[in-house]
């Protein structure tokens, strides 16, 4: 498995899956860089799974308070988790968040490389703990295009197991202008894959999104005929220093769809997917066509 730092196994934790708690609010897992946890009041628990460096407990796995907490940073990789959570919270303010940190930090404050092996380990934890925390969606923005949708062994099985429990794994297609392939893990058949639309135009200036304009698939967005949905990728996102910043990218669209999925969650994965498809409209560019979901900002 190749390593990456971009937008973009641990087989078992030795415990049996607990019984579901129907009275708990929905929780979304955000597999990402970690966050300065003091920024958010809706964090349910925290997890750290690292390939390089160590979690706060000195090991490569940690669960509980402080596990996903990271220092304030302006590094684009290390701000990413904060940005994703801010979008999910904007779409569904009532959601609970479980950040899973998969990116280590060097002594100089830079990110270590990481791979989909870390994503797989994070998914392992979700499978075991889904019922305990009432996890209903998993947001993944990391990845890379690999031949034949290569992923670590057991990843597809984890995603299928979560789908069977009415848990959506929602992943970004990537920003490589690839019109035939998506990031792994977005390319897996049981993943809800999300590409980006750009509206009102393809620049990166912080212009307000226009819901009356025709949504157009962004030129930078990866996608193909199997891409589940496209959504607006133009967002003002929270930064670790508490300020906001205008950003574009399939990660933003993915986080928005994650929040929207939880807002509209039905009794089964398929029913929710079908509902999102029913409220979508066609979108396209000169290379791709797909289903666009309007998500109010």
What does each of the following model-derived ranges do?
Residues 3-12:
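Bacterial N-terminal signal peptides
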Residues 16, 20-22:
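Boundary at the C-terminal end of the N-terminal hydrophobic targeting segment
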Residues 23, 86-90, 111-139, 150-170, ...:
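Mature extracellular/periplasmic domains of secretome proteins
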Residues 23-98, 104-106, 121, 125-134, ...:
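Active-site core segment of subtilase-fold serine proteases
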Residues 26, 32, 183-266:
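Extracellular S/T/G-rich loop segment that most often corresponds to the catalytic His/Ser-adjacent loop
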Residues 33-37, 103-107, 143-147, 175-179, ...:
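Solvent-exposed loop/turn segments at secondary-structure junctions
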Residues 73-82, 174, 244-257:
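Gly/Ser-rich catalytic serine loop of serine hydrolases
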Residues 133-142, 153, 165, 193, ...:
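C-terminal subdomain of the subtilisin-like protease fold in secreted/lumenal serine endopeptidases
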């Amino acid at each position: 498995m190749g390593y990456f730092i971009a937008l973009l196994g641990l087989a078992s934790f030795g415990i049996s899956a607990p019984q579901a708690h129907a009275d708990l609010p929905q929780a979304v897992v955000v597999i990402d860089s970690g966050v300065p946890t003091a920024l958010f009041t809706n964090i349910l628990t925290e997890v750290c799974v690292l390939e390089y460096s160590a979690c706060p407990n000195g090991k490569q796995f940690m669960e509980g308070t402080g596990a996903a907490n990271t220092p304030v940073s302006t590094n684009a990789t290390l701000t990413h988790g904060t940005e994703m959570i801010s979008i999910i919270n904007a779409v569904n303010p009532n959601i609970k968040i479980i950040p899973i940190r998969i990116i280590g930090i060097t002594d100089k404050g830079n990110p270590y490389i990481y791979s989909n092996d870390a994503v797989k380990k994070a998914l392992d934890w979700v499978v075991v703990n889904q019922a305990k925390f009432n996890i209903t969606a998993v947001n993944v923005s990391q990845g890379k295009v690999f031949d034949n949708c290569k992923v670590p062994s057991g990843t597809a099985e984890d995603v299928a197991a979560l789908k069977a429990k009415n848990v959506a794994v929602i992943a970004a297609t990537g920003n490589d202008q690839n019109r035939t392939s998506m990031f792994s893990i977005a390319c897996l058949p049981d993943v809800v894959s999300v590409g980006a639309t750009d509206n009102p135009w393809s620049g990166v200036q912080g212009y307000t999104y226009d819901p009356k304009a025709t949504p157009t698939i962004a030129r930078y967005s990866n996608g193909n005929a199997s891409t589940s949905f496209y959504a607006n990728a133009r967002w003002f996102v929270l930064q670790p220093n508490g300020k906001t910043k205008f950003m574009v990218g399939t990660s933003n669209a993915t986080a928005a769809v994650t929040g929207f999925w939880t807002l509209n969650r039905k009794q089964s994965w398929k029913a929710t997917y079908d509902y999102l498809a029913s409220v979508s409209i066609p979108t396209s560019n000169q290379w791709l066509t797909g289903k666009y979901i309007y998500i109010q900002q």
